[in-house]
């Protein structure tokens, strides 16, 4: 199963408690730049393709900014265009100029999870039970089609197809969206969601290689419970895995799971922290963290909000070389939104939108 080329757009802001006026201004700029009239969120450096992750992040932002008209348009386009009626989940990628805009009929569970979480938050924000009903249907499909027990652990596969290799599973630990899983557990009272949280955290505690003791973007879980970087991808902690401390921090900013991340990040001056590290060879990226990556670093280390504000900006990074030697524009036009203490904490985290394995 080939790994296709990777391209995307960097969109960054600081992680911080933002004044509502600032947040609304940023949201309007985000919509103007990345939201099409039909509410499709575009990856402007990748032929204006769209992904369920981008739709889900934008839906979360719409809720956080109390923008119900935008939310409804986002949800309507996503539901009507990307829904896989065979399983209730969503086709992960849409290419507007392809003969078949949805050539890959697989899903991506991070996108599905974000969409369901946004719908659940919308119900709380606007007291419309239809949103919660839609969220419940998606989470039920996630449990039915993507959650499996393997090596004594309950895990969520990255997609319905292509990740169960019989003697091992290929997992993406950045798809372990703990704050969403916690919300689903509180909503449904199903033990499966709490087991996913506890088993996911237990697995993360055992993922770590090289001098950094950090996980790679993609991890192979063997039937005997042992784990190693998945052979189909470069063994790097990079633009996928950087979201792991983000999701951990949203659930528990004092979690022991953050210890290796803090140790590695603190081993470099702030502006000289490498953008990625090869956890097998200890090779680091020839460029440093900026924008959203720095925002995740600052959040993980508990840096003062004043420092985070200094990184608040929009950045477009030009392509460097081939994807295998490292492109600097592997970042999606997506945005991550969390709400803590009933106030918006906003990060447009720079990351790559990895073209996924297909059968």
UniProtKB/Swiss-Prot annotation:
**Any single Pfam family the record assigns to this protein:** Glyco_hydro_8
**Which keywords are on file for this protein?**
Carbohydrate metabolism, Cellulose degradation, Glycosidase, Hydrolase, Polysaccharide degradation, Signal
User: SUPFAM superfamilies this protein is in?
Assistant: Six-hairpin glycosidases
Classification via Gene3D superfamilies? 1.50.10.10
Q: What class of enzyme is it?
A: hydrolase
Reaction it catalyzes: Endohydrolysis of (1->4)-beta-D-glucosidic linkages in cellulose, lichenin and cereal beta-D-glucans
Q: EC number(s)?
A: 3.2.1.4
Renumbered to this chain, the signal peptide range is 1-23
Q: Where is the active site?
A: 53 (proton donor), 110 (nucleophile)
Which GO BP annotation is one of this protein's?
cellulose catabolic process
What InterPro entries does the record point to? Answer: 6-hairpin_glycosidase_sf (IPR008928), 6hp_glycosidase-like_sf (IPR012341), Glyco_hydro_8 (IPR002037), Glyco_hydro_8_CS (IPR019834)
Q: Does the record's keyword annotation contain Transport? A: no
- Keyword field contains NAD: no
Return one GO MF term.
cellulase activity
Q: What does this protein do?
A: The biological conversion of cellulose to glucose generally requires three types of hydrolytic enzymes: (1) Endoglucanases which cut internal beta-1,4-glucosidic bonds; (2) Exocellobiohydrolases that cut the disaccharide cellobiose from the non-reducing end of the cellulose polymer chain; (3) Beta-1,4-glucosidases which hydrolyze the cellobiose and other short cello-oligosaccharides to glucose.
Q: Which family does it belong to?
A: Belongs to the glycosyl hydrolase 8 (cellulase D) family.
Q: What protein name does the entry list?
A: Endoglucanase
| Organism of derivation | Cellulomonas uda
The organism's lineage is:
Bacteria, Bacillati, Actinomycetota, Actinomycetes, Micrococcales
């Amino acid at each position: 199963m080939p790994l296709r080329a990777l391209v995307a757009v960097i969109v960054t802001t600081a992680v911080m408690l933002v004044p509502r006026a600032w947040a609304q201004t940023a949201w309007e700029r985000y919509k103007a730049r990345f939201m099409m009239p039909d509410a499709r969120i575009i990856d402007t450096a990748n032929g204006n393709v769209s992904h369920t992750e981008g739709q889900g992040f934008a839906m979360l932002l719409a809720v956080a900014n109390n923008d119900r008209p935008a939310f409804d348009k986002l949800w309507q386009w996503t539901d009507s265009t990307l829904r896989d009626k065979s399983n209730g989940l969503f086709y992960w990628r849409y290419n507007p100029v392809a003969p078949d805009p949805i050539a890959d009929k697989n899903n991506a569970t991070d996108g599905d999870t974000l969409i369901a979480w946004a719908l659940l938050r919308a119900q709380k924000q606007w007291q419309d039970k239809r949103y919660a009903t839609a969220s419940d249907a998606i989470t039920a499909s996630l449990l039915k089609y993507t959650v499996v027990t393997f090596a004594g652990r309950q895990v969520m596969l990255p997609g319905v197809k292509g990740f169960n290799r019989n003697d091992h599973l290929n997992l993406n630990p950045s798809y372990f969206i703990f704050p969403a899983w916690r919300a689903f557990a509180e909503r449904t009272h199903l033990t499966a969601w709490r087991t996913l949280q506890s088993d996911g955290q237990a697995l993360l505690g055992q993922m770590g290689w090289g001098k950094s003791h950090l996980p790679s973007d993609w991890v192979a879980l063997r039937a005997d419970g042992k784990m190693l970087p998945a052979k189909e991808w470069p063994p790097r902690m990079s633009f996928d895995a950087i979201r792991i401390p983000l999701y951990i921090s949203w659930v528990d900013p004092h979690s022991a799971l953050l210890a290796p991340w803090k140790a590695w990040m603190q081993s470099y001056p702030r502006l000289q922290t490498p953008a990625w590290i090869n956890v097998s060879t200890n090779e680091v990226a020839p460029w440093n963290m900026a924008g959203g990556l720095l925002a995740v670093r600052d959040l993980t280390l508990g840096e003062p909000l004043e420092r985070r504000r200094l990184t608040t900006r929009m950045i477009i990074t030009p392509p460097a070389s081939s994807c295998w030697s490292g492109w600097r524009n592997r970042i999606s036009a997506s945005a991550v939104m969390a709400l803590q203490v009933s106030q918006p904490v906003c990060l447009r985290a720079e990351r790559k939108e990895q073209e996924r394995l297909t059968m």
